[in-house]
Amino acid sequence: MTAESRERFTEVVRSEPVDLAMACLLLGAEVAADLKPEPYLYRLDGLAQSASPQVAAASSAAEQAAALATTLGDRAGFGGSGADYLDLRSSLLHSVLDRRRGLPILLSVVWLEVAHRLGVPAYGVGLPGHFVVAIGTPTGESALVDPFAGGRLLPPTAAAEIVRSAGLDLTAEQLAPWSPVEILLRVLNNVRQLAATAEHFRTRLWAVELTLLLPRHPLQVRREHGELLVGLGDLVRGAAELTAYAEAVGPVDPVAADRALQEARLARARLN
């Protein structure tokens, strides 16, 4: 990603409302520097146009969900499989639109963006271990669908089973809408986890740096940033980031602050 792309990403994620599709496409510029978001936005427009006649004829949230599933799942072939969890492309919206394969959360972004273009109320739901979409409103009629399974309708029993597989019981809080920033944070966290090994440090680095550009992010990410910079040999910036993290976390976790300061001292010592 160029400095210009990162500046644009920052503007998008700090605007209201957040343009989720644009933010996800700008994220993809980290691996494809010449990526142009506009053709992919037009592709989302085209998917919405294809779904429009059936969606317009729907008279309930469940019928709207079924209409979207016909276009996005049956006709366009959007879905996923276990192998997609190990593929970085599954976390990049432009690749998901090209391949029509992806992680649940990126497939959900496709659904949300198509629904938005059609004026259909929809929101993302981050069930433990699996991301899905609700067609409808949080306080009114809604229907849960699983974009990873081609848009399969999820009755309450199926949603409860997904949550139960994570060792939990389904609660109302788990069905709450996710904001675009929360979705972006999860997307970037997925990239960070996929790139956890040393040979993928640079991929993990850009995921961390984009996370730090979000208006809200876990403080721990700043420490991770410092450690990555040190690991990649950027000792000055790494030590400075670890020190900044220590200053921020010190009032609530002095032990963590002391550890970070020790890491910063060791990094600076390597400069001599």
Region spans (language model):
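A structural boundary/capping signal
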Residues: 1-272
